[in-house]
Amino acid sequence: MERYTYEIIFTRLDGQPDEIQQHTSEELARECFRLFDKPDSAEMYSKIEFSCHDWETGMDEILETMTF
C-alpha cells in the first residue's frame, strides 16, 4: 500500500462536495488538478482543493486550493 493518497475535492457552487478523485501519484494528481485551473470551472465549482493524506501518520494536508 502506498504511504500517500492525493485527493482532488470539487465543491459545487452551493457549497456541497461534488466529487473526490484519489490518486497515488502526486505528479498525476497535480496534472489533473491543473486541468481545472480555467475560468469556466467557476461555472460549476466554488472551490477545488488538492490535498494529501499520509497513511503512516493519519494526517491530511491541503497542498493547493483554487477558489472561484
Where are each of the predicted segments found?
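Solvent-exposed serine/threonine-rich low-complexity stretches and specific carbohydrate-binding patches
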Residues: 22-25, 66-68
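Surface-exposed loop/edge segments in extracytoplasmic proteins
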Residues: 15-21, 57-62
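Short, mixed-charge low-complexity intrinsically disordered segments
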Residues: 38-68
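Generic structural motif
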Residues: 11-13, 26, 53-55
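A short, charged, amphipathic alpha-helix used as a generic interaction element across diverse proteins
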Residues: 23-47
